[in-house]
A protein has these predicted regions:
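C-terminal substrate-binding subdomain of Rossmann-fold SDR/epimerase-dehydratase oxidoreductases
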Residues: 82, 88-177
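Aromatic/pi-system hotspot detector in well-structured domains
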Residues: 28, 76, 106
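Residue-level signature of the cytosolic catalytic core of signaling kinases
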Residues: 73-77, 136
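Active-site loop immediately N-terminal to the catalytic Tyr-X3-Lys motif
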Residues: 35, 77-78
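N-terminal Rossmann-like NAD(P)+-binding domain of SDR-like oxidoreductases, especially those catalyzing
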Residues: 1-70, 90, 110, 119, ...
Length: 177
């Protein structure tokens, strides 16, 4: 019988474990059933289930945070918000998947970190999962237009051929899943 050396295991998950956000007008809560629709969301859902089962079986304290889309400093440049800004400044097309009507919630990375710290440093939250969101759902195309409008106001020297950054929007084939 080995003594449990874990003080707490924290799993960071994604709201994609609940499935496509377009299917429901009701935001998921912690009791919402998982319905992953892509290999990525299925692996995150599987990880959540493994953490829960290991925690219960081996008495390992755990917490799970299920988070919406993060944005902020040092984000990978291929993610939506950085790609809008970087491509705009270079005068390159801004790819928008499908019709752009996919709804996403956005959470600043510092808010996400603060939420995780509140969860992991409070013993009453052990063996629970929490949804974390910015509570600001927006369609991808609307977010792209908002950022383009801000860039139109802030950027003094646009690429020569460009009058409005929104002209760079390029609807591309939606990704599978």
């Amino acid at each position: 019988d080995k003594k449990n050396k874990f003080k707490l295991f924290h799993q960071v998950s994604t709201d994609e474990v609940f499935g496509d956000s377009e299917r429901s007008n009701v935001p998921p809560d912690e009791k919402t059933a998982y319905s992953p629709s892509s290999p990525y969301s299925a692996t995150k859902a599987s990880s959540d289930h493994l953490v829960t089962s290991w925690g219960r079986t081996f008495k390992i304290p755990f917490t799970i945070s299920i988070c919406t889309n993060n944005y902020g400093p040092f984000q990978f440049p291929e993610k939506l918000i950085p790609i809008i800004i970087l491509n705009s400044l270079k005068g390159k097309k801004i790819p928008v998947y499908g019709d752009g009507k996919q709804i996403r919630d956005w959470l600043h990375v510092e808010d996400h970190v603060n939420a995780i710290l509140k969860i992991v440093f409070n013993k009453k939250y052990i063996n629970q999962k929490f949804n974390i969101s910015g509570n600001n759902q927006v369609k991808n195309i609307d977010l792209v237009k908002i950022i383009c409008n801000q860039l139109n106001e802030l950027v003094i020297s646009k690429p020569k051929h460009l009058k409005d950054f929104k002209n760079l929007i390029d609807f591309v084939k939606d990704r599978p899943g």
